[in-house]
A protein has these predicted regions:
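Pre-Walker A adenine-sensing motif
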Residues: 18-28, 258-269
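P-loop NTPase motor core
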Residues: 35, 108-190, 194, 345-429, ...
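Short beta-alpha junctions and helix-cap segments that line functional grooves
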Residues: 52, 75-80, 177, 181-185, ...
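Conserved P-loop NTPase
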Residues: 2-11, 113, 122, 199-256, ...
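Short glycine-/polar-rich loops that comprise or flank the Walker A/P-loop
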Residues: 32, 59-62, 87-88, 169-170, ...
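Conserved inter-motif catalytic segment of the P-loop NTP-binding fold
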Residues: 61-146, 302-380
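Conserved nucleotide-binding/hydrolysis micro-motifs of P-loop NTPases
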Residues: 69-73, 81, 95-100, 142-144, ...
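Walker A/P-loop NTP-binding active-site region of P-loop NTPases
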Residues: 27-93, 265-327
């Protein structure tokens, strides 16, 4: 939207007090305007309003909280639950306590059922003129809407409120809980900007909270939904990842695993700045092979991260140690992050933010997501998963990071099914399979896709013996290994000799 010729100077931007929301708004809110924060009860409107005012207090500004639905004591309880104090904040309440309703009360209080809207607003504006706050929050508009009794009168009073604040060097947040009539389109048209807070129920786990900036006149903002949480300390907003905003030119180089035969499968190593999918049935060795790359990166002095959906950190470390992969010292040194992720408690937006934080703070070179099955369970639908994963993989690839993702297929032998088709997003695919030989169930692996450069097309045996991971010679005597129903097609005597060697 273009500005009028006389408004050559851009508006001053002030922080909302919520870092993630400021990111969504490209800095914050335009000073001296009126904004609507809309959402159902319990979505975090009051908390956001308090954070907005406390940011003003921290900057030495005068601030005011107009409590239309809560008493000052209730507001102080909310602040205390987050470790805050309302000191330095003028709280103007219009809800009477029992003492204030008694004949002994020494001052007048206004109640929505007893006074007219004009009288109530006159009282508020008089207080504003005396205090001259630079930030003000109205909580909430439902009481004003009840006082108005009709939409026309209500709209006129809100317009008058807007004009008063615009001319008073004051930035105003109007909180609306939408308990009457759902979304107020008229109010949204009056406000300079609209922020919608939502809380979505799930069959299991915590509610998923998200926000959307519906409009912001004359200003850029990141469209779409952004996950957020409410914790002790306020709202924590996780802006939607847009990979196009993070384009960099990172050099390509081969990333080695520490096992020469595994590197040969990828034609000399996995390329940095690519995504590799480790695909196979449960227990086939996907997580252990991924741990090789994490350990190898840490040994080179590079940072790496593992986000585990399926195992506890204790189990992950114990299994890795049993295979000669000691990550403990690297975790203690801060080179490796091993984070257990609970999809029932963490939204995808928060998960992506955790990856971004580690990558940007530590300049990580390897990121492992173990597994995508856990991430799928955290998503409401497959379409959203593919879009989110596309942005995440693009972001990591642009930073020159090698990303490893494990995906467990259903079944162990024979035909297997994928929970979601995500292979087209991967630059390389390393497939794992079980096969039977000499009365034993063994494992095999092969690279079936690599976008950049050549790769070995052989199928090799994967062995976990002697406290280490070993990659065997190509399985030239078997056919149909990757189908899950192999057929021996080689020399029987060689097969028997290998069986004896394995027993030894």
């Amino acid at each position: 939207m273009t500005r009028s010729p006389d408004s050559s100077q851009p508006p001053t931007i002030i922080s909302t007090g919520v870092t993630g929301l400021d990111d969504v708004l490209f800095g914050g809110l335009a000073r001296n305007h009126l904004f609507l924060v809309s959402g159902d009860p319990g979505t975090g409107k009051t908390t956001l309003g308090l954070q907005f005012l406390l940011e003003g207090v921290a900057r030495g500004e005068k601030v005011m909280y107009v409590a239309l639905s809560e008493s000052k004591a209730e507001l102080e309880e909310v602040a205390k639950s987050h470790g805050w104090t309302t000191a330095g904040m003028r709280v103007f309440e219009m809800v009477p306590t029992e003492e204030e309703l008694s004949p002994e009360a020494q001052y007048t209080v206004f109640h929505p059922a007893e006074v007219e809207l004009a009288d109530a607003l006159t009282s508020v504006l008089k207080e504003v003129d005396e205090e001259k706050p630079q930030r003000i929050v109205f909580d909430s508009l439902s009481e004003l809407r009840m006082l108005a009794r009709d939409a026309l009168r209500y709209r006129r009073q809100i317009l008058a409120l807007k004009r008063h604040f615009v001319g008073s060097n004051c930035t105003c947040l109007l909180l609306d809980d939408r308990t009457v009539g759902g979304e107020d389109q008229q109010l949204q048209s009056i406000a300079h900007g609209v922020i919608l807070l939502q809380s979505l129920d799930r069959n299991f786990g915590i509610k998923r909270r998200r926000l959307e900036v519906r409009k912001m006149r004359g200003a850029r903002f990141r469209e779409g939904f952004h996950d957020f949480t409410i914790r002790t300390g306020g709202l924590d907003v996780f802006p939607r990842l847009i990979a196009a905003e993070h384009r960099t030119k990172a050099p390509k180089r081969p990333v080695h695993s520490g096992i020469e035969a595994l590197d040969e499968l990828f034609g000399g190593g996995v390329d940095s700045g690519t995504t590799t999918l480790l695909l196979g049935p449960a227990g086939s060795g996907k997580s252990s092979v991924a741990a090789l790359y994490v350990h190898s990166a840490a040994e080179r002095g590079e940072a790496a991260a593992v986000f585990s959906f399926d195992e506890t950190t204790a189990t992950y470390l114990k299994r890795s140690r049993s295979l000669g992969i000691d990550l403990d010292q690297h975790i203690a040194a801060g080179r490796v992050l091993l984070q257990q992720v609970d999809p029932a408690e963490m939204s995808v937006g928060e998960f992506v933010a955790a990856i971004r934080t580690f990558v940007e703070m530590k300049d990580a070179r390897v990121v492992v997501i173990d597994s995508l099955n856990g991430l799928i369970n955290a998503m409401p639908g497959e379409d959203y998963l593919l879009l989110q994963m596309h942005e995440l993989f693009s972001y990591l690839n642009q930073h020159g990071i090698m990303t490893l993702c494990t995906l467990a297929q259903s079944g162990f032998m024979g035909r297997m099914r994928n929970p979601v088709d995500i292979s087209y997003l991967a630059d390389s695919v390393l497939m794992f399979r079980y096969f039977e030989s000499a009365g034993e169930v063994r494992q095999a692996l092969s690279v079936v896709k690599k976008r950049s450069g050549s790769h070995e097309r052989a199928i090799r045996e994967l062995r976990f013996t002697g406290g280490s991971i070993q990659i065997g010679a190509p399985l030239v005597d078997f056919e149909g290994v990757l189908t899950g129903t192999p057929r021996f097609a080689g020399n029987l005597s060689r097969r028997e000799d290998r069986g004896k060697a394995g027993a030894d």
